[in-house]
Amino acid sequence: MSESTTAKPTKKLYIQTHGCQMNEYDSSRMRDLLGASHDMVPTDNPEEADVLLVNTCSIREKAQEKLFHQLGRWKHLKEAKPDLVIGVGGCVASQEGDAISKRAPFVDLIFGPQTLHRLPEMIETPRENGAVVVDISFPEIEKFDNLPEPEADGATAFVSVMEGCSKYCTFCVVPYTRGEEVSRPAVDVLREVTHLASQGVREVNLLGQNVNAYRDDSSGEVIDLAELIAAVADIDGIDRIRFTTSHPMEFTESLIQAYAEIPELVSHLHLPVQSGSDRILSAMKRGHTCLEYKSKLRKIRALRPDISFSSDFIIGFPGETEADFAATMKLIEDIGFDNSFSFIYSPRPGTPAADLPDDTPEQVKKDRLKILQTRIIQQAQEISRRMVGNTERVLVTGYSKKDPGQLSGRTENNRVVNFRCNQPELIGKFADILIEEALPNSLRGVLLGSELDD
C-alpha cells in the first residue's frame, strides 16, 4: 500500500507599499525573494495572507502615524491568526525601529532597505523572550548579491542601479535612512536588464535616490550614468530608457550629451529643484543656483526640443517669503514644467532644517501650494492640447482602467494614451496612435499601426 502525501498549502504574501519608485522596486524584489525561498504567492487580500509586510516611506509628514494606523488595522488579524508574520520595512523602519517595537509589540520583523535580502532568515528566526527581530543595518549593497533573478511584470520594469544619497540636503532624511551613495557594478545592472528583456520588457527605469551620481569603478575604469545608459541601450529588446531621481549638481555634460546620442533615452526628464529662490536653495544646501538649474535644462532642450520636464517643489520651507515663492513661480513659467510632486514642507526629525524657525502661517502655505499646482496643471493641459493631431509612438501596457474596450499605454513624454482596440496581443508592443483628444489626465487616440503589422 503506497503512502499518501499531503502537499503543504501555499503560503500567501501581502505587501503594502508607501512612497517612491525605489520602494516599489524593493517590494517587487521582496515578492521575488520570498517566492523563491518559501514558494509564497502574492495576494491582494491581507486577511488571507500568512505574511504581512509594509514597506514604509519617511519623506512626508505623518509617515509614522500612517504606519501605526496600518499596523492597528492588522493587529486584529494577528489576534485571530497567531502564526501570522507581520513585518515593517523601508525608511521608517530604519529611522524608528525602537519606536515601532514599543508601540506595536505584535510586529515580528523590522528591517531596513539594505537588509531586505535577509527576509527568508528573519521569517524563520524564532522570537526569543518575545523580542522582535530587528535588522536595520547598512551592509555595503550586498542585498543585490543575494536576490533571485527578477520576474518581469509587463513591458516596463524598474532596475535599481544605486542606493543612498550623500548630498545631505537640510530637509531630507534619505542619507540617514538609506545610507551613503553606493553604486552597483555595471555588469550586474546589465545582467538584470538582459534578464528582464528576455521576458519581454521593452522599457526600463534606472533607479536611485540620486541616480545621476552613479559611478562604478569595480572594473578599474569609471563608468558613469551616461555610459551605463549607452550600455543598456545596446541590449536587444530594450527600446526605452528612463532614470529617476536626479540631482542638478550631478547632471554632467556627458549626461546632457546622451540626449543627442542615445535615441532610446526618452524625451522626458524628472529633475527635482525644490525652489526657484537662490536664498532658499542655499538654506536647503542644494549646492546650485536657480540659473545653474535652468542652464542645464536649456542645454537639454536644445538637443531635444520636444522634451518635457517635471520636478519636485517644497512649499513653505522655513523663512520662505512672498519674494521667494514668486521666484519659484517664475522658474515654473520659464521652464514650462508639465508635472510636479509638490508638498508643503514638513520637518523631518533629525534633519538640520527641523531646527529652523517656521513663522509662515499654515494657510499661506496652503494658498501658495494651490497656486503652484494650479499653474502646473494648466501648463500640462496646454502641452497635451498641442499634442492633438500628432502621431505618437506608444508602448501599450494594458487595458484602460475605465474602459476594458480600450487599450492603454504611455508616450515618451509620459502621457497616458487610451485607444479603442480589440487586439490584446498588442500589449507589450509599440503602436502608432493619432492623438484626437486631450483629457485632463490622459490623451485619447486611434490606432494607425503597430509592430504587429511588420
Curated annotation (Swiss-Prot):
Gene3D superfamilies in UniProt: Methylthiotransferase, N-terminal domain, tm_1862 like domain
GO CC terms in record: cytosol
Catalytic activity: N(6)-dimethylallyladenosine(37) in tRNA + (sulfur carrier)-SH + AH2 + 2 S-adenosyl-L-methionine = 2-methylsulfanyl-N(6)-dimethylallyladenosine(37) in tRNA + (sulfur carrier)-H + 5'-deoxyadenosine + L-methionine + A + S-adenosyl-L-homocysteine + 2 H(+)
Residue span, MTTase N-terminal domain: 11-128
InterPro entries assigned to the protein according to its UniProt record, in alphabetical order: Elp3/MiaA/NifB-like_rSAM, Methylthiotransferase, Methylthiotransferase_CS, Methylthiotransferase_N, Methylthiotransferase_N_sf, MiaB_methiolase, rSAM, rSAM_horseshoe
Subcellular compartments: Cytoplasm
Swiss-Prot/TrEMBL keywords: 4Fe-4S, Cytoplasm, Iron, Iron-sulfur, Metal-binding, S-adenosyl-L-methionine, Transferase, tRNA processing
Record note on cofactor: Binds 2 [4Fe-4S] clusters. One cluster is coordinated with 3 cysteines and an exchangeable S-adenosyl-L-methionine.
Residue sites binding [4Fe-4S] cluster 2 per the record: 165, 169, 172
GO molecular function: 4 iron, 4 sulfur cluster binding; metal ion binding; N6-isopentenyladenosine methylthiotransferase activity
Cofactor: [4Fe-4S] cluster
Domain TRAM: from-to ranges: 385-449
Pfam family membership, one: Radical_SAM
Residue ranges constituting the Radical SAM core domain according to the UniProt record: 151-382
EC number: 2.8.4.3
Function: Catalyzes the methylthiolation of N6-(dimethylallyl)adenosine (i(6)A), leading to the formation of 2-methylthio-N6-(dimethylallyl)adenosine (ms(2)i(6)A) at position 37 in tRNAs that read codons beginning with uridine.
HAMAP family per record: tRNA_metthiotr_MiaB
Similarity remark: Belongs to the methylthiotransferase family. MiaB subfamily.
Assembly and interaction partners: Monomer.
Name of the featured protein: tRNA-2-methylthio-N(6)-dimethylallyladenosine synthase
Organism: Saccharophagus degradans (strain 2-40 / ATCC 43961 / DSM 17024)
Gene of this entry: miaB
